[in-house]
Amino acid sequence: MTEMEASHRRWNMIAGAAVFVTAFSCYLTTIGSTLAFWDCGEFIATAYILGVPHPPGTPLYQLVAHLFTMLPFQEKAFSVNLMSTITGALTALFIYLITVKILVQWRGTPKGPRDRMIMYSSAACAALAAAFSSSHWSDAIEAEVYAPSAFIMTFITWLMVRWGERYREPGSRNSLVLICFLIAISVGLHLGTALVFPAFIVFALVVDWRIFTDARLVVLAVFAIILGLSNHLYLPIRSSLNPRIDEADPQRWAAFKDCILRKQYKPMTIFVRQAPWSFQFSMFWRYFSEQWTGAGGSWTILLMLAGAFGAVIHYLKHRRTFILIAGLFLMLTLFLIVYMNFTDHEVRDRDYFYAHGFIFFCPWIGVAFAYLADLTASTKWSRWLTPVALAVMIAFTFSSYFVNFRTHDRRGDYNAHDYGYNMLATVAPNGLIFTNGDNDTFPLWFIQEVKNFRKDVRVVNLSLLNTPWYIWQLKHIEPKLDISFTDKEVNELRPFRDRDGKIVMVKDIAAKDIIDRNQGNRPIYFAVTVADYMGYDPHLVLEGLAFRYEPKEASESIDLTRTLYNLYSVYKYRGLLLPAAGGPASAPQFTDVRKWGGADSTDFASRYVYDTKVYKDTNTQRLVTNYAAAHLKLCVYYLQNAEFDNAMRELERAILVSPGFEGYKEIAVATYGYAGQIAKAESLAYSFLAAEPRNVNIYLQLFRVYRRANNQQGAEGILMRLINALPDNPDGFSMLASFYEEQGAHAKAADIVRRWLDLHPNDKSAANLLQSLEKKVRGE
């Protein structure tokens, strides 16, 4: 090794370490303290108990994450999050190393300080662009499979590039065996990791096609692949022990195969598009364009143009490695657009599917920056111009850190944790609760398995209830449910169409049987997030975040005592509410839950504030509206019983816990109006109408407020405003005509109906009404 090469190796290691420390520090200062919504709760819970998560099971992730749960941290969720943080930072490190190798193959080993400065700074910019990209940053601070998968992908790619440099050296083919093993074993992290394989094959063909004629190498590669895939034996081994979370029950060959192939999900097809091509590509472009500047940013195009320019330079300077990087980028972006075939109504943003592709775009940013820096080095002002240019490039890269920091800071975010805790705490001892999907199921599993809280409650996920293995587990694994079907009958359950033509799903059959067999023995609940209550609505009574099922039709739709107790004395709101300055350290406790008297009740909203320090994405905001909805339900109850002070308290609490919730507007107008605060009701209504001039319910609610206050002029005025704003809406005309009739102003009523008929001459019922009114005007 020459002195120049030794110097390069030493400084390259120092720069790489700096990149790793920078990325790791970024992630460590924004890492989630506990679980996040979506799959995180499930992955942490199954890693902790060595269970089986949703197909395809991610066995390698479970094993490695379980080791992280053994770290001496009290919060096990943080320990598993740390796995993503470390692998996310390692991903940035290997993007740096890959970019350096590309630059060395093009520019040669750096010959002096300025050459090293250009190379290492440009490669660091590429790595930090990857580290600060929105999707990868999100993956690196929560318990998900994508950061470990990205690390393995970049490590494999670095090995490929390294082999491409040394393929003529003795023993270099051993790297290919290692690559095959890593690709195979990493499928146990995420199936998408296998997408590096086509790029690997093409790159190997371009570099040295003769390796495919080496029988010994082929045999070793096949053996390495089989050995790597063997980590999937975890699934049947652990499943046979019946852990409390055992999705797909893959202990038998048929179930194991179905788990790997994800048979329980809707089959994918690339030929029947689930959304127009234009939508799917525009969705991808939106995700791509928001990576470094956030939604609505204007700088992204510059960074993306730099990457596109770098791709051209890379192609011109070193086509071998260009083929590898371009192949990876295309497989992880364009291929996925075609293969994943996303709908135009996905339940969440799917940017994380393309995160690896965005990462492999970043080396081209480094190539572009190095090329531009070289241009400055060839000028007579290079002594100062090159450092300035590199400083600008580094600052530009770091700008994405500051732009994305707010939306990626998970410190203090306990919303998912407390949501799961609160929902479980709602359920009476030994109860069961029907849930709907990921976000009302996985946090509950986490709280039960990791926190060891309320394991007496049986969580029944309605989506999984369509599968026979899940029904079997509900029947045979503690806490067991009484189910009338035999195991054979469970396997034979199929959807059918009833007499009315409605499709009855397996979950409908199973849920009805569970309710029929367990009512009276177990308290039964439905989470408020359940979309279809299967006709049991009249039997459901709200108790906070869940409805309790009553065998007979309920006389009240809300249990006032239990709901108040849960909302104010049981539920936790960390990351959502904070005590105001000088306020209490914890939520007040009830003494008389029906008439919550004393100082605690009158100024609650002023003693607690919305926690603006904790960022809440749209999904979190949507889920916490369930707290607001419960308070609004209480508000309506109090309005109906003329308890206006209590109604205002609940309204203010609803607005406090979910400021962006749209559902409170009409109720707010009613609450203040019925409480006699007409001016405030008017002010609110007109502010709402300024933003939503076509919101009919606001007009009508303010009309009712005026009528209740005997303000006939105000009532007439708001209805006139409604018919002027919405001349095609019949409600305003109908109510105004009725209002005039009640006042005995039949002529005015007739004029309103004529005005409607001028716009809608074919309305026969309006024509008949006009005839009746005209008779009254004539005194007939």
Language-model segments: residues:
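Loop-to-helix entry region of an early transmembrane alpha helix in multi-pass inner-membrane enzymes
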Residues: P59, L71-L93, L97, R116, ...
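ER/secretory pathway lumenal C-terminal domains and tails of membrane proteins involved
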Residues: T2-E3, V100-G108, C125, I141-A150, ...
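Canonical tetratricopeptide repeat
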Residues: S79, H631, Y664-K665, Y699, ...
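Canonical positions in the second alpha-helix
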Residues: A654, S687-F688, R721-L722, R755-W756
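Juxtamembrane segments of multi-pass membrane glycosylation machinery
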Residues: L50-P56, V64-I86, T91, T99, ...
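Terminal, low-structured helical/coil segments at or just beyond the last alpha-helical repeat
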Residues: E742-E780
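Extracytoplasmic catalytic/substrate-binding loops of multi-pass membrane glycan-assembly enzymes
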Residues: I31-F43, P53-V64, F78, R244-D249, ...
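Register position in tetratricopeptide repeats
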Residues: Q640, Y674, R708, E742, ...
